[in-house]
A protein has these predicted regions:
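Extracellular carbohydrate recognition and processing domains
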Residues: 189-240, 252
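Extracellular ligand-binding interfaces
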Residues: 42-43, 151, 160-204
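Extracellular carbohydrate recognition
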Residues: 235-262
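Solvent-exposed strand-to-loop "edge" motifs in beta-rich extracellular domains
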Residues: 52-53, 109-113, 144-163, 170-174
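Short carbohydrate-recognition loop motifs
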Residues: 96-115
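Extracellular recognition modules
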Residues: 23-27, 228-230
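Extracellular carbohydrate-recognition regions
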Residues: 35-89
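Surface-exposed, short loops/turns at beta-strand junctions within beta-sandwich domains
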Residues: 13-20
Length: 262
């Protein structure tokens, strides 16, 4: 129990069960406080967090049980593959065998020479994707509806091949070697961000290694209504010019991120 000032106290309860009703009452000496009831939030399992499920349609890979990352009810994750395969092979693909951590893993590859847009970082995210050739920046939409408990951490396994910056973007401007990026963001039902956490990989890691980061809440009162988890082989590959047409982030052609078991 923690005392704040002279009259305020707080206590942390551990070992509570998900989605369960509880009653609590404070005892001090021989005095009993009022009984208060509360319900713990329900833990929700997100689909395909082990990246075992993939579907291929032509050159395009989808991290879903259907060849869709837009409006099919079975689609939950998305990639930018539909846009990339206009010019190249899919930049986000499943891998197996010695290239995987367990079963299948996701591999993301950065192209530093894409016609018109300039560059394309491999990505994998909870959300939707619909190619907008006129404004590529608006093609992805990050996040899907979420009504589960407030997560406190995100962990998983990754390895990374960081390449020297070859695409002469202006953001951040002084980057010498590429960086990978994994983050989680939560919004409330008003669309306001309430929590965020991230992992940034700055060097080559040749063997699968565990990553873990805390999720920090800027608002602990509002309940989460939307969640996004995003992974990319180039942290600045999603930075576009003011018209949303051309990448201005610095990336390294050939940078590759592998992830598994979120």
């Amino acid at each position: 129990i923690t005392e704040t000032g002279s009259t305020s106290y707080s206590a942390e309860l551990t070992g509570l069960q998900s989605g369960t009703d509880y009653e609590v009452r404070a005892l001090a000496g021989g005095s009993e406080g009022d009984v208060y009831s509360f319900q713990t939030e329900t833990i929700v399992t997100l689909p395909n967090m082990n990246f075992e499920t993939w579907t291929q349609d032509g050159k395009t890979w989808y991290p879903n049980p259907v060849a869709d990352n837009l409006d099919d009810p079975q689609a939950y994750w998305a990639t930018g593959n539909e846009g990339v395969t206009i010019y190249k092979e899919s930049s986000t693909v499943p891998v197996t065998g010695s290239d995987a951590y367990k079963g299948k893993s996701a591999k993301m590859y950065t192209y530093g020479d894409i016609l018109l847009v300039g560059a394309a970082a491999g990505n994998l995210f909870i959300g939707t994707y619909k190619t907008n050739v006129g404004k590529p920046e608006s093609s992805p939409s990050f996040g899907r509806a979420y009504s589960g408990a407030r997560p406190t951490k995100l962990s998983g396994y990754y390895k990374y091949k960081s390449m020297p910056v070859t695409y002469a973007g202006t953001v951040p401007g002084n980057l010498k070697t590429d960086q990978c990026h994994i983050y989680l963001r939560l919004w409330d039902d008003a669309g306001q961000e309430i929590a965020y956490g991230e992992f940034i990989g700055t060097e080559t890691v040749t063997e699968y290694t565990k990553f873990e980061f805390d999720i920090k809440y800027s608002n602990t009162e509002s309940k989460p209504a939307k969640i996004a988890i995003v992974a990319t082989s180039s942290k600045y590959g999603g930075d576009f010019d003011e018209n949303g047409k051309k990448v201005i982030g610095q990336v390294g052609d050939g940078s590759t991120l592998w992830v598994d078991e979120f």
